[in-house]
Amino acid sequence: MSNKHPLVQVIENAQLIERPSFAPGDTVVVQVKVREGERERLQAFEGVVIAKRNRGLNSAFTVRKISSGVGVERAFQLHSPIIDSIEVKRRGAVRRAKLYYLRERSGKSARIREKLAPRAPKVVKAKTDARVPDAVETAPGI
């Protein structure tokens, strides 16, 4: 429950940007707008989401990747205008909300299992006792 003034809530809700849903353990590619002088380009930051904070306009998430053997973490504001897009590469199966323990791990011990897609429900065919005739007769004149 928020204790914010209703007018503040309206203004904050107007600034929310639609983003894909993701969770800690997911591997994401964040396209970040980078200014170099007068030029603006997109820079991809791909890594594992180790933390996510859901607070409306103040929502944030942290992405960790290994670059040249060195761990690099970057925190992003979810609704920030410098984020061009977020693409979820793979879903990770984890049992924690914060994956800070990955900071001490490297190599195979830092791997995260992939979440399997949910199974489709089995379709059971109903047995019918009525037999379907081989040839259906039509009334003359039709």
UniProtKB/Swiss-Prot annotation:
Keywords, in A-Z order: Ribonucleoprotein, Ribosomal protein
Gene Ontology annotations of biological process type: translation
Gene Ontology MF terms: structural constituent of ribosome
Positions of disulphide bridges: none
InterPro entries the record matches: Ribosomal_bL19, Ribosomal_bL19_CS, Ribosomal_bL19_sf, Translation_prot_SH3-like_sf
Pfam family, one: Ribosomal_L19
GO cellular component, one term: cytosolic large ribosomal subunit
SUPFAM superfamilies, A to Z: Translation proteins SH3-like domain
Homology family: Belongs to the bacterial ribosomal protein bL19 family.
NCBIfam families listed in its UniProt record: rplS_bact
Function: This protein is located at the 30S-50S ribosomal subunit interface and may play a role in the structure and function of the aminoacyl-tRNA binding site.
Protein name: Large ribosomal subunit protein bL19
Native species: Psychrobacter cryohalolentis (strain ATCC BAA-1226 / DSM 17306 / VKM B-2378 / K5)
Gene name per UniProt: rplS
